């Protein structure tokens, strides 16, 4: 049975985990790190870089480096590189493909199935887009799981049978969620969830960048926002400063040669940022986490004192101000320190993958839909069929009627959100039910059914009870990708995977050829410079020289077949040289030994007397 992995596809960093003997293990990437930056870059030589290599070259390749694409999931965002448009799904798929490759290298087998996590407050379009990214990456997405739910699963699975209430405070690179869950007897049930899809560590970084821009403008009069390369350096410095301020009271931000003045003199940026100043310029961001917390407590119908454990998720929760706020909101409760906020979501996803594959027994995960779902009815009102925080999967039906006499069809407009007026919510999709027989208004009965699957993806059906006619829609307009487009992107991704494989193979061939040229060249040089001259004729050495020259010429080009051919020829000439040296050495030994030499060589010294034997380790034999 194929293995399944758990993937935390994050805004700034992503993690992959797998079950080994029933226990979740976080897989280190090819660079040796347990987290992979969610960054994709298109190098000018055509290579696509993902993760740390992409991050390393971001300063010198600003326009072709894409980060924080998770914030664009479920929208019509795209970026054009070399005349080709890439959607958010395609960029995310690149990150997923790297995680898949790294996990396959670790396990030594192919991976086809995955559980991918999303912020609890992701709407239908964002979930659908995440699933599509997985498909483009060549993964069968078994389940889309909410990040706080995965974290609670990882945290609470070994906490015994006593029922406990857990608050998960998840502040990542680009999104914020707070969820209340109940765990007991192998059941993980989400009671309520709330959040903000546009609040995360990136916003804290941006505040430091803006602060640095203002400081520099005040001292030099130059606006760095007009210099893309300088802004990229500021972003990297801001992220580093934010991390340092989690453990220090102040940090130095020193960027030499950040720009030049009107006279082309280099200018330096050197600022000291204190933790107090950092907290002052980001206080409003922190305050934005308060309301979702209050909403969750109210929706779950509990008091703060009922919370047994607080789990912090996401690297941004390492900021002292965030930890202090959580303690304040929970009445002084100390957040749990036993989980790694960067890895716990992927660990939970791997456990859920194990549940779905039957590797983990007696665990039931009951998730919820984060936002209400309904349709637009007369007067533009949002009529909710499924309230937010309803446990999924779920199915609800309600009967509606026509608004006008002899109305031949009804337009079903599906919305997601909490506003009373439908237009103020997110339109997920619409479809029409036609063929309703003529009848006075209020007579036809149209049954509308909402069905949410375990991934949180919505299916809506409208049925005329009188005629039995029905129409169904699977909500996917939000992502804007048709099946044909997804198939095309999958093929593109596969083609690029083949390109990447070829590129790696070419690099290996080139490296082998260069190494062979170097070693052979050195060997020939040593022969010519040997005391007493070379043991082999110059003619033999010249043939090797010619093969070396051919190999160098091939290496100067791009034809890999030519390099392989030249390498093969050089290998043959090298072997011939080695054989000639061996024969010359044997001949010398025979001449030097005379009659005694023949005896020492084992009798007559003829080739027929050579004996096949094994070399024995004397030390081992004597033991």
Swiss-Prot record:
Ranges annotated as biased composition (Gly residues): 594-605
Alphabetically ordered keywords of this record: ATP-binding, Chaperone, Nucleotide-binding, Phosphoprotein, Stress response
Xref: CDD domains: ASKHA_NBD_HSP70_DnaK-like (cd10234)
PROSITE patterns: HSP70_1, HSP70_2, HSP70_3
Positions with biased composition (Acidic residues): 609-623
Record field: transmembrane: none
Any one Pfam family match given in the protein's UniProt record, by short name: HSP70
Sites bearing Phosphothreonine, chain numbering: 175
Keyword Coiled coil: no
Stored PANTHER family: HEAT SHOCK PROTEIN 70KDA
Name the UniProt record assigns to this protein: Chaperone protein DnaK
Highest classification ranks of the organism: Bacteria, Bacillati, Actinomycetota, Actinomycetes, Mycobacteriales
């Amino acid at each position: 049975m194929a293995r399944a992995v758990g993937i935390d596809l994050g805004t700034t960093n992503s993690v992959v985990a797998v079950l080994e003997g029933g226990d979740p293990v976080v897989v280190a990437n090819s660079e040796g790190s347990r987290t992979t930056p969610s960054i994709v870059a298109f190098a000018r030589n055509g290579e696509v870089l993902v993760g740390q290599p992409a991050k390393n070259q971001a300063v010198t390749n600003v326009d072709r480096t894409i980060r924080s694409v998770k914030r664009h999931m479920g929208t019509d965002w795209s970026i054009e590189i070399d005349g080709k448009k890439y959607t958010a799904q395609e960029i995310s798929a690149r990150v997923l493909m790297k995680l898949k490759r790294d996990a396959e290298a670790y396990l030594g087998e192919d991976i086809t199935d995955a559980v991918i996590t999303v912020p609890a407050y992701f709407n239908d379009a964002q979930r659908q887009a995440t699933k599509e990214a997985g498909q483009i990456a060549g993964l069968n997405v078994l389940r889309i799981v909410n990040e706080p739910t995965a974290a609670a699963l990882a945290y609470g699975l070994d906490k015994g049978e006593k029922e406990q209430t857990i608050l998960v405070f998840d502040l990542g690179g680009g999104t914020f969620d707070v969820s209340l869950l109940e765990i007991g007897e192998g059941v993980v049930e989400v009671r309520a969830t709330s959040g903000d899809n546009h609040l995360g560590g990136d916003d804290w970084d941006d505040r430091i960048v803006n602060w640095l821009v203002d400081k520099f403008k005040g001292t030099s009069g130059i606006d760095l926002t007009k210099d893309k390369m300088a802004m990229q350096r500021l972003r990297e410095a801001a992220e580093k400063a934010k991390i340092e301020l989690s453990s220090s009271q102040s940090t130095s931000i020193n960027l030499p040669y950040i720009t030049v003045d009107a006279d082309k003199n280099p200018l330096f940026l050197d600022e000291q940022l204190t933790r107090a100043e950092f907290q002052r310029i980001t206080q409003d961001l922190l305050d934005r986490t308060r309301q979702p917390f209050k909403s969750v407590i109210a929706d779950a119908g509990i008091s703060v004192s009922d919370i047994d454990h607080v789990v912090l998720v996401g690297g941004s929760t390492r900021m002292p101000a965030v930890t202090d706020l959580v303690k304040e909101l929970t009445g002084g409760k100390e957040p749990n320190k036993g989980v790694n906020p960067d890895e716990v979501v992927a660990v939970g996803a791997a456990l859920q993958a194990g549940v779905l594959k039957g590797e983990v027994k007696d665990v039931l995960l009951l998730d919820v839909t984060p936002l209400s779902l309904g349709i637009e009815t007369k007067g533009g009102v949002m009529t909710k069929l499924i309230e937010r925080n309803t446990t999924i999967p779920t199915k609800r039906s309600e009967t509606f009627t026509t608004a006008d006499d002899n109305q031949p069809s009804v337009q079903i407009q599906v919305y997601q959100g909490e506003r009373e007026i439908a237009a103020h919510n997110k339109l997920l999709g619409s479809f029409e039910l036609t063929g309703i027989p003529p009848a006075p208004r209020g007579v036809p009965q149209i049954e509308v059914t909402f069905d949410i699957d375990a991934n949180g993806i919505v299916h809506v059906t409208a049925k005329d009870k009188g005629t039995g006619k029905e129409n169904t829609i699977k909500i996917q307009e939000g992502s804007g990708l048709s099946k044909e487009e997804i198939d095309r992107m999958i093929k593109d991704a596969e083609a690029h995977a083949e390109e990447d494989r070829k590129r790696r193979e070419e690099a290996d061939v080139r490296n082998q050829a260069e190494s062979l040229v170097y070693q052979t060249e050195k060997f020939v040089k040593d022969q010519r410079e040997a005391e007493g001259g070379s043991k082999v004729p110059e003619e033999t050495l010249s043939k090797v020289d010619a093969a070396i020259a051919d190999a160098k010429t091939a290496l100067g080009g791009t034809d890999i077949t030519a390099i392989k051919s030249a390498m093969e020829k050089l290998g043959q000439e090298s072997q011939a040289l080695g054989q000639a040296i061996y024969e010359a050495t044997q001949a010398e030994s025979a001449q030097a030994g005379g009659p005694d030499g023949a005896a020492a060589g084992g009798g007559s010294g003829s080739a027929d007397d050579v004996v096949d034997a094994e070399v024995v380790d004397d030390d081992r034999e004597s033991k």
